[in-house]
A protein has these predicted regions:
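N-terminal ligand-binding/catalytic initiation module
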Residues: 2-164, 358
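Generic secondary-structure signature for well-ordered alpha-helical cores
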Residues: 46, 50, 61, 102-109, ...
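Short, ordered loop/turn segments at secondary-structure junctions
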Residues: 78-80, 88, 117-118, 143-149, ...
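Glycine-rich phosphate/diphosphate-binding loop of Rossmann-like nucleotide-binding domains
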Residues: 83, 88-108, 160, 166, ...
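General beta-strand structural signal in soluble alpha/beta enzymes
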Residues: 114, 140-143, 164-167, 198, ...
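Adenosine-phosphate binding glycine-rich loop
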Residues: 167-168, 187-189, 291-390
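Rossmann-like adenosine-cofactor binding region
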Residues: 243-310, 315-317
Length: 390
């Protein structure tokens, strides 16, 4: 059985103490300019601030030169799909959004502000973001339930001239594709030939499937299942997002679909993939069991029946964590630096390949220190780079 990570466990009380120690919360705003004299104050506010105001009024692009817009991202949620906890409301999502904001700063030196919108109406959310969106260089949507997340993101992309990125969809897809690229390399398999089974048909699963197809996996080689079974053409009550991934097949269950599969991607619920199912997979199976907090199958259960498997999860206490933190800060960093108006499929694929390539490099000392002294090397237990790898 493969070993677990050396990352220390923590209790709920320790997490609460972390958020409550010193100043409450995790973020604060600091001045980037001197603010120690009366002259500094006059330049920063009245009357000096009138000069950049006039310039921006004449040329809105000047906001990139005279304000923090070009390095500022709004992290936005309505709390309708918080982590694995569900719909707990806008305010309850604030610790997550603050956490997202600090990750932007820590890993890509991007300033981010969390904004929680207390509404379940996608049109209200769209209208709100449209009104303040131009104050930011980019919009990161987070923890918004499907199908509203699709509707909101698409409309904002059409309306705003800055990048809009739903990380639960695209961050997951980019990181998963990076892991898949390396897993296929280690397994000597071609992306054009593999058979893939996806459990879950929510935002993350649909985004992963979309990116897999753009990357070269044929449509008919991917079988997707929701809580009612396989998405097949002719099945009743499929929305437009699920219908796009329905295929002609007589397969109806996970047990049938997994037979001979090269790849299993789980973004669904715990314990739905059994040892017997894993036994039926192809040689050198690739298993991404990413349900949180508990995976579709535990890695040790996989290794009990298959010593040729490559396994990834969404957890930090196992190797190969599918963690969006290795993606979204740097994707936004690149987009902001070139003043991109959108984050397109080509950019996502390029990011996935860059992340995959990073895992093949030697692990530097600072990464080993952050991982409790471990120095992983590219292979079955290190297909996705550490969060702390610069």
């Amino acid at each position: 059985m493969k070993k677990k990570s050396k990352i220390e466990k923590y209790t709920d009380q320790e997490a609460l103490d972390y958020h409550n120690s010193g100043k409450s919360g995790k973020i604060e705003i600091n001045s980037s300019k001197p603010m120690s004299t009366q002259r500094d104050l006059a330049l920063a506010y009245s009357p000096g601030v009138a000069a950049p105001v006039k310039v921006i009024a004449e040329n809105p692009d000047a906001a990139y030169d005279y304000t923090t817009k070009g390095n500022l991202v709004a992290v936005i949620s309505n709390g309708s799909a918080i982590l694995g906890l569900g719909n707990l409301g806008a305010l309850a999502s604030k610790p997550v959004m603050e956490g997202k904001a600090i990750l932007f700063k820590r890993f890509a030196d991007i300033n981010a502000i969390d904004l929680e919108i207390d509404s379940s109406d996608p049109n209200e959310i769209i209208n709100s973001i449209t009104k303040f969106g131009k104050s930011f260089g980019g919009i990161n949507l987070e923890d918004i339930a499907a199908p509203n997340c699709f509707i909101i993101e698409q409309k904002l992309k059409e309306t705003l001239d800055i990048p809009v990125f739903h990380d639960d969809q695209h961050g997951t897809a980019i990181t998963t594709l990076a892991g898949l690229i390396n897993a296929l390399d280690i397994s000597s398999k071609s992306i054009k030939d593999i058979k893939v089974v996806v459990t879950g048909a929510g935002a993350s699963a649909i985004a992963c499937t979309n990116l897999f197809k753009v990357s070269g996996i044929p449509n008919e080689n991917i079988i997707m299942l929701d809580s009612k079974g396989v998405l097949y053409r002719g099945r009743d009550n499929l929305d437009q997002w699920k219908s796009a991934h329905a295929i002609d097949t007589k397969v109806r269950t996970l047990e049938e679909a997994i037979d001979g599969a090269d790849v299993f991607l789980g973004l669904s619920k715990k314990n739905i993939l059994t040892k017997d199912m894993v036994k039926k997979m192809a040689k050198n199976p690739i298993i991404f069991a990413c349900a949180n907090p508990d995976p579709e199958i535990k890695p040790e259960d996989v290794y009990e029946v298959r010593d040729d498997a490559i396994v990834a999860t969404g957890r930090s206490d196992y190797p190969n964590q599918v963690n969006n933190v290795i993606g979204f800060p740097y994707i936004f960093r690149g987009a902001l630096d070139v003043r991109a108006k959108t984050i397109n499929e080509e950019m996502k694929i390029a990011a996935a390949h860059a992340i995959a390539a990073l895992a093949r490099e030697d692990v530097p000392d600072e990464v080993a220190a952050a991982m409790g002294g471990e120095r992983p090397r590219y292979g079955k237990e290190y297909i996705i780079p550490s969060t702390f790898d610069p």
